[in-house]
Amino acid sequence: MTEAMLKTAPLSTRPILSRDEAATYTREHYFARGGWLAAPDGPWHPVPVTSPPEGRVLQVDARKGPYRTVQQAVNAAVASGPRDARVWIAIAPGVYRGVVYLPAGAPPVTLYGTGETPQDVRLELALDARFTPQQYQAAVNAHGEFQPGDPAWRDYQRIAASGAAEIGTRASAVVIAQSDDIQLVNLSIVNTLLDHIDGAAHQAVALYADGDRVQLERLRLISRQDTLWLSSRSAPQGEATHISRVWVADCYLEGDVDYVFGSASAVFERVHFHTVSSRGAGEAFVLAPSTPYNLPVGFLVQQCRFTTDSGFGHTLYAKAGRAWDHGARETGYQPGRTANGQALVRDSVFDTGFDTTAPWGAAATTGRPFVASRRGERNELRVNRLVEYQNRQGN
């Protein structure tokens, strides 16, 4: 995506904002309001988590304790309150296998790795959306990690005792974060299903979050399909009743199909998106926003890197993304009723493994063909809301 490419690429497949248009797409704009639309919160101005912990600090260490699992510390934080005081959970270097639930209504929690790098603290498990509830029980609660009366018991039971044929995408997450004001810092979350399955649809989420004012800093989030799901508490039919704001900064995200997706208002800054071909999934997509049709903004990606492995750049090319027409499998896309994903990728670098002529694909779920927007119609519901500004090609 050199300057020459930007000037000659057809606007019918690659819509580019003007300078005046791009000036309105800022972090402040994306974070101007949040929470329930019936009584929204005001602007959010996140700052990096750099100061030493204040208030309660719970120590997690798999060898010494006092908490040997992350969930034990989360349970203690939820049980002891108060609801408005931040709880810091310090996680010692090591590998922690198991699911972590941060239930709705929990106090503000900061989970942070105490190692020198995010690789030093690793939360992991192999989960597949195709698992039966019985398989989920065996993977998640084989040793009684979750018990009646635990703060997360209801969340666990909702999946394990559902009676459904498959657990579904959200339940495949290694970390499920459903409270507001969560901060995750300096650690790795890995759904280790990875390349142990075929290239068909195997949603395997590393992190699911639907709270407001969520901060993700210096994380490594690794999976294949559906690595990071940034959702909201709105119903999936397409109209927003709730806005979840998420700031993703200085992170590494890895996957193959729709691996950053959802309905949140999210800003990504200095993030490395790495697309892999190792599972043989074929065409790859990074972003898959499902922005409610009545919200003007979804994903803002700025000053980021998009890279691919050696399987791309010859006959196979990755795409920057596609819209996710969430909830419209039976009806097809319906303007003014179906979600219409919004994303702007700006001031970022793509390697040669990406499609520079048609970076946006047909919508997930419905197969709706990509239709580029033009100046003056960026939020029209009969076109896609996927655009770029001042990106370039490099290593």
What are these regions (language model features)?
Residues 2-395:
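Sequence-level preference for short, compositionally simple segments enriched
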